[in-house]
């Protein structure tokens, strides 16, 4: 890891700040699985969309990571998209002030479980008992709206993004989770999905302009 006053070392330390995907992905083992020399990965989990306290703990370390993947879970949708956007902008600002590379991550898509899955029938019962409970359609609608904003924001601010949704969805026009990536409940992923996600991390890291973030270490960022 790098000290605030030092240039990045050859070995770069990357943290994934997220929830269930990071845990089951076994993110810390990804460099070994993919033969990625020069990287160490760490997963830090935090339930709930607001990860401010956990992020501050990471940023206050004596030796901070070189990059942080900012990942949110589909379970937090539908939600207050305006608040979610404001929080994500704050996370990016805090990372930049610390000279850490913020890497945005889209939310993985969801789907209705197959009719032969127990979760499918559980969802029907829940709709009857809790009619105000968010539907899968509502969850998908909000998370794709958030993803669209996140991709636009990454372009505006010249930030790299790992597009989990694109890797896992059926198509550009059908943004549901692919059936062969469904862990069984329409929300969580299976081993095939995680193997697919392994393949999109390194290309993202290779595009990072690490020197850009060294220059802002300890300075006030102008990114909105």
Where are the predicted features?
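Conserved SGNH/GDSL esterase-like catalytic core that processes O-acyl groups on lipids
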Residues: 2-86
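Short beta-alpha junction loops
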Residues: 99-100, 106-112
């Amino acid at each position: 890891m790098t000290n605030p006053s030092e240039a990045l070392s050859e070995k770069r330390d990357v943290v994934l700040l997220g929830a269930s995907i990071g845990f089951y992905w076994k993110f810390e083992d990804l460099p070994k699985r993919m033969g990625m020399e020069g990287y160490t990965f760490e997963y830090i989990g935090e339930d709930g969309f607001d990860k401010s306290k956990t992020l501050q703990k990471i940023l206050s370390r004596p030796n901070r990571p070189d990059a942080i993947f900012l990942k949110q879970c589909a379970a937090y949708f539908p939600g207050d998209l305006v608040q979610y956007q404001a929080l994500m902008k704050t996370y990016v600002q805090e990372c930049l002030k610390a000279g850490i590379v913020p890497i945005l991550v889209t939310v993985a898509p969801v789907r209705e479980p197959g009719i032969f899955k127990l979760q499918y029938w559980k969802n029907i019962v829940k709709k009857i008992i809790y009619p105000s409970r968010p539907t899968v359609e509502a969850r998908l609608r909000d998370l794709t709206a958030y993803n669209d904003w996140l991709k636009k924001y990454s372009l505006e601010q010249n930030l790299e993004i790992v597009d989990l949704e694109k890797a896992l969805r059926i198509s550009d026009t059908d943004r549901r989770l692919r059936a062969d990536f469904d862990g069984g409940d329409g929300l969580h992923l299976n081993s095939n999905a995680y193997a697919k996600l392994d393949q999109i991390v390194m290309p993202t890291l290779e595009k990072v302009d690490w020197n850009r973030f060294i220059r802002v270490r300890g300075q006030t960022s102008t990114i909105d």
